[in-house]
Amino acid sequence: MLHRNVENFIGCDSSYRTASIVLYGAPFDSTTSYRPGARFGPAAMRHESYGLETYSPYQDKDLTDGNVFDSGDLELCFGSSESALVDIESRAAEILRDGKLPLLLGGEHLVTLGAVRAAVRKYPDLHIVHFDAHADLREDYLGAQLSHACVLRRCHDLVGDGRIHQFCIRSGDREEFHFAARHTDMHKFDFTGLTELTDWLCQTDVPVYLTIDLDCLDPSAFPGTGTPEAGGVSFLQLLGAIRTVKKANIIGADVNELAPMLDQSGVSTATACKVLRELLLALEK
């Protein structure tokens, strides 16, 4: 049984027993390749969420009407990526075992791998829907295979060809794009093709893990991230994508790569909070 976090995300006041969605944080950024600070993302989102209403006019739903439990942040070893991933996998597996949807707050994008390891053990036919500026398909980064630059490559090791669906991708090296052409379903620059994919996911009813790297957003709207990339989507485009893909059989999700200290205006944290609110409401069945 998980116990309540001291400061939970606004509106996430259900007990663990009654919850259908469980938030858990992974404050980890030890493989960051450019600007660190994503480890502070989960705490910042919880704290700043109290400047946000629980009600969404976009969806006419309120967090207080749902069943979300915030279990707080994991205590992770910054010196060992594998140790951190084992802890994340263990928490995700516990939540899945109890019949609830785990929603992970990063942290850098590598944390997704721990959650996907747990998900694919329970759902061997898992598909991954990935919103990101970066392909994250490197075999290794500076010799490290466990890096935020390699996370979708490691996920591919688990799920295989044709089960990773990537959107908004606008950055990566040549080998990553060549790998994607052979092994993943990549949609560059925006969400073109998401409606058709979602229709297929719904028809087949395959289990889906949704991973959202917030740097899919344009840095004019979301500068507070470790590796910003010009040419991203707007908040409203991301919201539309969430509301589209929610129709699929989503069994787990994450939101990652907010580095709050890199945006002293607080706009990035406020945006991340709003994305999380809309995602929570969309996933409430």
Model-based region annotation:
Residues 1-285:
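Conserved alpha-helical scaffold segments that buttress catalytic/binding sites
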